[in-house]
């Protein structure tokens, strides 16, 4: 089993391995055999693309949840240098310390200064420890708020990348006021007089995501998720069985398609065929195009209108008809 592929991707992995094997022997083959190998590679690639389209056309919510956490999926730091022209990182909350799980600083997008804030997970063991598996502590959210206030002062739009399983639930974080830090961000962002765009690039977990996700435009990548609890957490509470995470995922309606339908998000960013991990370069281009387009659109609105629209959006969440 290829560990770079999820269970439902294994048929694709088998074809890709065959393609790689043929590609490796192509250089050693004579002219006649090389032409034959090239034709076989073309046929296998065509078969792989067709199979990928078939599999990804009918993904379950649980399979999309797995894609959102794919080990090869791009994280916040992977995007910065390609999406933004410049980036200068700023550190610390000026109260307790610097939380590495929150990356923030001044960036330029299409020659427009913006304040960028994003959640970072980590790929290697050392990185996961450094970034606390993408679970911010109170000082991370207070750093984010400090940067947002700085953006307000200099009339800069704010761009946030959401990718977290949730806020860190450790004793130290609770002692330092985790819930207060999240609540303060929700309160301040709801009336912050500057444009805000949030993008869920992977996993949007509960209040830990919301704390940098109150925005005028909320976007999600096609195979990202956004919910009040993880499928595993929901399954352990509702079904007393974590193995029923697939059922919980269906109930949570956590995918971009469901959330767009419920008007909880505004824009779905299409992913390359097979997901972001199959074509990272194309994913970066797609994100930059949509982000630039939405930023130019939102900048045209007067601040008063922007705040009215934001308030209307927030107050509209949770409404239902009997």
Curated annotation (Swiss-Prot):
Primary localisation category: cytoplasm
EC number: 2.1.3.15
Presence of the UniProt keyword Transmembrane in the record: no
One CC-aspect GO term: acetyl-CoA carboxylase complex
One annotated GO biological process: malonyl-CoA biosynthetic process
Cysteine pairings via disulfide bonds: none
One function term, GO molecular function aspect: acetyl-CoA carboxylase activity
PROSITE patterns: COA_CT_CTER
Subunit: Acetyl-CoA carboxylase is a heterohexamer composed of biotin carboxyl carrier protein (AccB), biotin carboxylase (AccC) and two subunits each of ACCase subunit alpha (AccA) and ACCase subunit beta (AccD).
Known function: Component of the acetyl coenzyme A carboxylase (ACC) complex. First, biotin carboxylase catalyzes the carboxylation of biotin on its carrier protein (BCCP) and then the CO(2) group is transferred by the carboxyltransferase to acetyl-CoA to form malonyl-CoA.
Protein's UniProt name: Acetyl-coenzyme A carboxylase carboxyl transferase subunit alpha
Source organism per UniProt: Vesicomyosocius okutanii subsp. Calyptogena okutanii (strain HA)
